């Protein structure tokens, strides 16, 4: 149903990628004494922002022109955090999503989540472009993966983004 939404340029679908990552994450969590449910949820959410048409289009392009703001799929993935009701689980999964490519801040090249602070409003606007459309497909994928889903408005997505900013700021000295 969602085979047109890819995770990688090699043709693997986003849904398959999230299923594969979840299997590995659950196995690792069980073997090291961590919560497998949190591992599964984090694995499912970590790349869900790849459902954005911006990411999908950039995935198809071979020679990408340099642009002022690179699409960071992990930022778009944050828009779905309110599907997790438990605050502690949500905070743990927030760290998983934010840190799976870059650090929270002072990343090499100043590309950590908090390093984007000076372009905060532009960052949200860019990553949430057409959210009302692509979020339906992202939620459809999550539903196929066994999640209880509900519509997420652009306002709720912004609230999730703002909550993540506040939480990440609380982690830094």
Segments predicted by a language model, with ranges:
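Accessory nucleic-acid engagement/destabilization modules that flank
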Residues: 2-8, 14-173
């Amino acid at each position: 149903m969602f085979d047109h939404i890819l995770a990688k340029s090699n043709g693997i679908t986003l849904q398959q990628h999230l299923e594969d990552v979840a299997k590995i994450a659950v196995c690792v969590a069980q073997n090291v004494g961590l919560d497998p449910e949190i591992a599964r949820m984090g694995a499912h959410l970590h790349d869900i922002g790849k459902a954005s048409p911006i990411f999908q289009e950039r995935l198809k392009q071979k020679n990408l022109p340099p642009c002022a703001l690179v699409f960071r799929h992990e930022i778009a993935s944050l828009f779905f955090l309110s599907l997790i009701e438990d605050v502690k689980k949500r905070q743990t999964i927030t760290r998983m999503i934010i840190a799976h490519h870059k650090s929270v801040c002072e990343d090499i090249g100043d590309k950590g989540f908090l390093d984007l602070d000076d372009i905060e409003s532009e960052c949200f606007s860019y990553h949430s472009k057409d959210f009302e459309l692509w979020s339906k497909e992202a939620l459809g994928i999550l539903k196929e993966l066994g999640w209880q889903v509900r519509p997420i408005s652009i306002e709720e997505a912004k609230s999730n983004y703002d909550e993540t900013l506040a939480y990440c700021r609380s982690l830094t000295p």
